[in-house]
From Swiss-Prot:
UniProt KW Glycoprotein keyword: no
Entry EC no(s): 1.3.8.1
Organism expressing this protein natively: Megasphaera elsdenii
Obligatory cofactor(s): FAD
Catalytic residues (positions): 367
Primary enzyme class: oxidoreductase
Domain of life according to the entry: Bacteria
Keyword set includes Oxidoreductase: yes
Keywords for the protein's UniProt record, in alphabetical order: FAD, Fatty acid metabolism, Flavoprotein, Lipid metabolism, Oxidoreductase
Role according to the record: Has an optimum specificity for 4-carbon length fatty acyl-CoAs.
Name of this chain's protein: Acyl-CoA dehydrogenase, short-chain specific
A Gene Ontology BP annotation from the UniProt entry: fatty acid metabolic process
Amino acid sequence: MDFNLTDIQQDFLKLAHDFGEKKLAPTVTERDHKGIYDKELIDELLSLGITGAYFEEKYGGSGDDGGDVLSYILAVEELAKYDAGVAITLSATVSLCANPIWQFGTEAQKEKFLVPLVEGTKLGAFGLTEPNAGTDASGQQTIATKNDDGTYTLNGSKIFITNGGAADIYIVFAMTDKSKGNHGITAFILEDGTPGFTYGKKEDKMGIHTSQTMELVFQDVKVPAENMLGEEGKGFKIAMMTLDGGRIGVAAQALGIAEAALADAVEYSKQRVQFGKPLCKFQSISFKLADMKMQIEAARNLVYKAACKKQEGKPFTVDAAIAKRVASDVAMRVTTEAVQIFGGYGYSEEYPVARHMRDAKITQIYEGTNEVQLMVTGGALLR
């Protein structure tokens, strides 16, 4: 793994940095407190071409033969330093919607759905989770019934969907044969505005307030056969392989959150004076900061390694699970310690470390809980 960033990777990193500093930082506190999903801001981000880093030029991207996964991961990490909600909005579009279409879609599907996602003219989402089917995807109740004309009729709902109600294109999973369990799940591509496809509850979340999360509702939604993604009954495999990539995006988000919290804690420790000297002059605080830095750097290596293995076309399932587990745990520990360094001020929404701590928690949950990452890693060891 080469630790030297290419010129292209540095360009994408700078794009994300400049956007974060100029566009996200000035308004993130207000948008977080008011729970504002800023569509104009997201549209501006998508127009920068960061979504294209992941894909080849053939589909509107910037890569020669499959794009550059690390460039995209660097951008997600950098954006998360400024606004974790915006970072996951990008990650869900690229990792969870565009990527499975690129990996499993037909050329016609790629032309119709992938290209606008890559070019940044449309936003994407991924609908797998249901009220009674979180980790256990085989327990989902959404049904896709095949009609005589070859179309499918979807009925059911999905919850906790990132970009729900904001996205233009959705990857949705439904049971086409309940008797087959996981082998009876099929993936479909749905478009916003399809008759019968509506939105339910908007989630009031602990963190990532600038990301929109909503319920998807399907009532007799007619889906053409050409919108089936992959083969019938292969949806579970598609979902799991998609989540592998999504975990690297979440790990990058967690890394960015942790870095922001550390930067805030370092700065505060230099300014806050107690007992006649800055907090950073107390060994207990300087050691705490050092430990936070060490954890972040260890997590960074795992995240970048997973991204590089995916880029190289090597098996990366376990690497993604490890990176996601470690980076999200580090984010939670680092943000908690940052709040501790701030003391009472850290518990106040007046300072950003409270937001960082709230944002960090979800990284231990979505794209598979951290307990699932242990199952994935342990299963690979014992196989």
